Amino acid sequence: MHIVLVEPEIPGNTGNIARLCAGTGMELHLVRPLGFSTDDKHLKRAGLDYWHLVRVHYHDSFAALHQQYQEHTFYFCSTKARHSYCDISYKMDDFLVFGKESAGLPEPLLTAHAANTIRIPMREEARSLNLSNAVAVVAFEALRQHQFVDLRIHGNGCHGRSTQI
């Protein structure tokens, strides 16, 4: 599974998403221009010491990325979409695409891929969720559909006691 951030602006969000990718094995694709330097201390701090676990790819444009992976399915996450992210049957090689924090994905991109746009249901009064939170919500739904393959599902219990949920 792949996470795509189109022109991300806030280094802390990208760092948090990188940490999510490290913990899940998802690949991270960053589409330029980035709103920060990859040497940014907030980016590195948010990703903690997990950067060595993340496969990060940089692309000069979304068109170049899409062309390179044209045989894959792309889902475009937007507050403007009609379909819920829960209505999709994800494949493990799908691309989940998210826009920049201030504006989301460009309207022409959403129009061109209208059939593959998805949204997270939320209150009408709320404009949007934080980018890193939105990525986590959609990513874990996709992983859940595949029984969290290759991920550790069970912990060691709480203080040596068996716990049931």
Regions found by a protein language model. Name each.
Residues M1-I165:
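Post-transcriptional modification and biogenesis factors for structured RNAs
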